[in-house]
Amino acid sequence: MSVLASMLAWTLARREHSCALIDADFVAGCLDLLLGVEREPGLRFSQVDAPLGRIEGEAMNHELMTWEGVRVLPYDPWSARQPDWWEVQAAIRALAETNDVVIVDAGQGGLIETVPDLRGGVQVIAAELSVMGLARAKSHRSRLDSWGCEAPHIVGVEPRGAPRGRGHVGIGEAQDYLTATVLGPVKPSVNLCGDVLEGLGIRSVTKGSRKAVSLLADLVEQAIRPVSGASCKDR
């Protein structure tokens, strides 16, 4: 999900949308490592202070590191401090004041239930195209529905390391199982995996991801277009 969120942010920035990327995966985190900007100066989530649940948007935006034109608020999981839900909401609202789009990597998605602005945002599920992956996606979609979220956009991701001809479910089968449109597939990239493992970060929207990410970016633009010029944000 973190790679997909990052590529979506990159694509929207290339389309001249101001974009912020928030790492709200408080179990794994390390979005700055994934992007190869861990040594860059900038605010981390463990340093966010939201007195009375409010943060000044311009000031916060200015303190963030920048990656490919995208403002990034990473989480450092080695810090003992995990942000409270109101701090997450305050960060989202602050960055929504100064960016066209705010993308939140919510990890496994449990945080969505407790943060009102996450429940009210556009939801995206990265579903592994395997029997197990689709079952998990279906379960998560049910959770989103129980929390009052809108129907999510679903992106199918081919499983890594599966034996040739085994363990992989096609887009058509995935759509039948989920009774929903599934974008993709996003194909694994050996070069991207190598770059991330070597600390070089994401250096492009990979060929195997380009079509799905572009279609997802189109959907985000459709979501913000009705109030173009106002302050509607994608979260």
In which residue ranges do the predicted regions lie?
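Inter-motif core of Ras-like GTPase G domains
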Residues: 97, 110-131
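Beta-strand-loop-alpha "switch" segments that mediate conformational coupling across diverse proteins
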Residues: 158-161, 171-205
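NTP-binding/hydrolysis catalytic cores, primarily Walker-type P-loop NTPases
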Residues: 197-235
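Cytosolic-facing regulatory segments adjacent to core modules
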Residues: 56-67, 71-111
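Phosphate-binding loop that captures ATP/GTP phosphates
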Residues: 12-71
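Glycine-rich phosphate-binding P-loop
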Residues: 1-6, 23
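Conserved C-terminal guanine-recognition region of P-loop GTPase G domains, centered on the G4
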Residues: 137-150
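Conserved beta-strand segments of the P-loop GTPase G domain that flank and frequently precede/overlap
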Residues: 22, 74-76, 103-105, 124-129, ...
